[in-house]
Amino acid sequence: MPAGTVPTKDDVLVPETLLKKRKNADQIRAAKEAAAAEKKAANAEKDKVIFSRAEKYVKEYREAEREQIRLRREAKLNGTFYVPAEPKLVFVIRIKGISKMAPKPRKVLQLLRLHQINNGVFVRITKATAELLRIVEPYIAFGYPNLASVRQLVYKRGYGKVNKQRIPLSDNAIIEEALGKYGIICMEDLIHEIYTVGPAFKQASNFLWPFKLSNPSGGWGVRRKFKHYIEGGSTGNREENINALIKAQN
């Protein structure tokens, strides 16, 4: 534009438009930076909560273990027998297929979500579930998992059910999205809820996709697989010995 010429309307609007675009871009960038900083602070705070809960659970587990030892020693000193509380949790593994299976046990296996051989699920022991386990006892192995078994299963083989999809538990956010309303926001919360059979056990166990285990190291042995555990076979209740089987299949 020549010197001394009065600027036209278009000459004025062009730089104003550019300034507005720059201002909008600056505002968007500032908003993104603020949101990122807020998210980082929130995540740091959540990490503190998760760490604190994990510490609390460790303390709780250790105190429970020490109490068991104390009660056993006390019973021994008094010349009596220590009778532990009835187990509330079992881990159930399907070990046989559908060949020659009657409709009723087949339906129960579906109800327990044991759709395939080597599928495993956590089950709360009630009068009703005990009856279901009795019906399908010739097709399953089950028992009382310890804390180590629960933790190893969830960390190594754990998948969540999200929108009917099998999703790896690679991020605590997946757990929080599904179970946060029950106060379960991380892996250790999930493990604690399962192991202690907490108030949200049903929701937690249903969130976990049935575990897909391997054949036990060394195999089942054809004859052993079709006999009850107390007869030297593989089916039925093996109580605490389920932990050795979990280790062999995990």
UniProtKB/Swiss-Prot annotation:
Listed GO biological process terms: maturation of LSU-rRNA from tricistronic rRNA transcript (SSU-rRNA, 5.8S rRNA, LSU-rRNA)
Entries under InterPro entries matching the protein: Ribo_uL30_ferredoxin-like_sf, Ribosomal_uL30, Ribosomal_uL30_CS, Ribosomal_uL30_euk, Ribosomal_uL30_euk_arc, Ribosomal_uL30_ferredoxin-like, Ribosomal_uL30_N_euk
CDD domains: Ribosomal_L7_archeal_euk
Domain of life: Eukaryota
Listed name of the protein: Large ribosomal subunit protein uL30
Assigned protein family: Belongs to the universal ribosomal protein uL30 family.
Organism: Yarrowia lipolytica (strain CLIB 122 / E 150)
Any one Gene Ontology molecular-function term assigned to this protein's record: structural constituent of ribosome
Keywords linked to the UniProt accession: Ribonucleoprotein, Ribosomal protein
Listed GO CC annotations: cytosolic large ribosomal subunit
